[in-house]
């Protein structure tokens, strides 16, 4: 900590040794914003920058699978689409397990409580495992909606259409709250060929019509979002 006060910039290198991707975050920057993020790929000749991380972080082909939802996220200053994976199964060993990789476990528990209380899905006796594909650690609250969608997709064993993505923060009463920089998220989804994106209804005000052809589906409650997906 003493050294951090002396230097102008502190960078943090993230990523486990079993994953090919590494993330470079700015923790301290005396001369600019700390909202910076770089994604690199480990190759045989060393680290190389990833110009379009969205294409690498999404499953290519292989058919539609349950328990997968695509989130339009923003980390640092760049938007990209990430794959949220969930597995829900009946607890076989007493106390149900809750596990999250790349996502805050306390927030996952909060979202599961919202599903129980506000939507009526009984998950108290289910094991729930959540994973953010690519080894990323995401803090953007806009992926709340995709987490809920992935969990319910796995619970009912029904796949979500592969050309739909979503962005929205989920509140304790089950409302879908507006998120920042929604225009960038929509543009990124359109660029990658998605036909529809679910966004908070509160983000419609002042939203410019995207140049690319993509259907914008506004939702204000978790229940409304689920009706659009299943």
Where are these regions (language model features)?
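Peripheral, non-AAA+ core regions of ATP-driven protein-machinery
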Residues: 1-230
